[in-house]
Amino acid sequence: MAGVKDENVFVYLNDTNVLSSEFKTVGIIPKLKIDRTKIHKIKFSDYFEKVAFKSIMDSKLENKPGIYPHVTSTSLNNGVKFYSDFWNIKASKSDPIISINNDGSAGYTFIQTHDFSANSHVKLFKPKNNELNLIITCLLLTNQFKKIKYSFNQPTLSMLTHDFNYDVFVYFNWIDFF
């Protein structure tokens, strides 16, 4: 592509409503140094570490309004069901947390950038690399969960977030997940 610097890689998602040769642009990953002539293995655990936390039941916080989000498995409002006066998970814009819904709206992935609490219906992960583009990452993760039809299946979440190698082929300026 003319005018595109080599260090930029365009990321495209295959849309199931269009022909497989058509892709939607979702963003650019800057400064990605990668050999574009071969298939690469990418492991989720190379980029994220699981965050251990004590889950809080919704009923214990619903009647205690406040400024801290309570993250659940909803697909709406960045996964936030309500706000309370309690938080037990530290997050910030410079140190964000990724939440992945286990059930309910299974597979939805969100970025949490403020201190919050969460129930047991989500899994939390922290990026190992601060340069990772989290917006694109969330789009790619949600797309992968939908592709394998993830729902109510803990072994699948474990496979996707720890054991599974994504085959990634970089061809000129786009990435395709097999």
Identify the residue ranges that each predicted region occupies.
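A short beta-sheet element
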Residues: 82-140
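Non-catalytic DNA-recognition/assembly elements of restriction-modification systems
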Residues: 1-78, 168-178
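Exposed alpha-helical structural elements
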Residues: 8, 43, 134-136, 140, ...
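A short glycine-rich beta-alpha junction/loop motif
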Residues: 1-4, 116-123, 151-176
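A generic structural signal for short, non-catalytic loop/turn and secondary-structure boundary residues
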Residues: 4, 37, 63-64, 91-93, ...
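Extended intrinsically disordered, low-complexity coil regions enriched in Ser, Thr, Gly, Ala
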Residues: 35, 46-50, 131-136, 152-157, ...
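Short, tandemly repeated low-complexity microdomains enriched for cysteine and small residues
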Residues: 8, 86, 112, 149-157
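Catalytic core segments in nucleotide and nucleic-acid processing enzymes
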Residues: 146
